[in-house]
Amino acid sequence: MRSFIPWIGGKSQLAKRIISEFPTDFERYIEVFGGGASVLFASDKHAPMEVYNDANGQLVNLFRCLKYHREELQKEIRYYLNSREMFADCQNRLESSGTTDIQRAAMYYVCIKISFGADTDSFGCAPKSLDTGRFEDIEKRLERVLIEQKDFEELIKQYDRPNALFYCDPPYHTTEKHYSERFTEADHHRLNAVLKALKGRFILSYNDDDFVRELYKDFDIKAVERQNNLSKGSFKEVIIKNF
């Protein structure tokens, strides 16, 4: 199953490769930096407990509305058009106190779908579909998934158990400006510290640079490549594990 949204830094190209690194004996699965949840949707290795988390409140609201109010969300999205004016209107109204959660979810979905590179900031001129035909399948997949909006350290400590598998896809080092939520150099170190103290297991996606390799030099590091979504050519990444 594919994600229902594109996302900056999304793992649609590497999802199967990441899933191939999954162990077979985990009882809880936690996506710490959920984003578009490409790995969650692509995996057929479902755990009894599954958690999706993201710091972006608009994104979390979209996931929750799709899970709990799918039909109402679909009806709301029907009223939106793929146009520059509609995009600007959605941007302006997203933070308005007069909008409902379902309206905000619909507007954020539109902003993701018709923006350039799913950045939600600039209108993408290429025609994009606002079809919601896959929403019912997504709703069913999310039935057993807990949806959280927590700081990554708080989340990891809350769900950490020996039988837990954490998938972490943080904002990449030196590319943090592309993400809506602030992520600092100190946060990269903070993530490293909490993963070093983990009782469970983790799989971590990162860009391949010297800073990352030095930070995680004590763990298993595998180099991979994917096509760059925002420019031509390939992008070097690493998959890091503690098992």
For every predicted segment, state its role.
Residues M49-D54:
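Conserved SAM-binding motif I beta-strand of class I
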Residues D25-Y29, A47, R161-N163, K199:
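A general structural motif
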Residues V60:
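Short alpha-helix immediately C-terminal to the canonical SAM-binding loop
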Residues M1-G34, S38-L40, K45:
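S-adenosyl-L-methionine
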Residues F33, N56, P171, N207, ...:
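Anionic group-transfer/hydrolysis microenvironments
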Residues T184-F243:
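Long, positively charged, glycine-interspersed low-complexity recognition regions
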Residues M1-L14, T24, G57, H69-H178, ...:
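SAM-dependent nucleic-acid methyltransferase catalytic core
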Residues F63:
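Conserved SAM-binding loop
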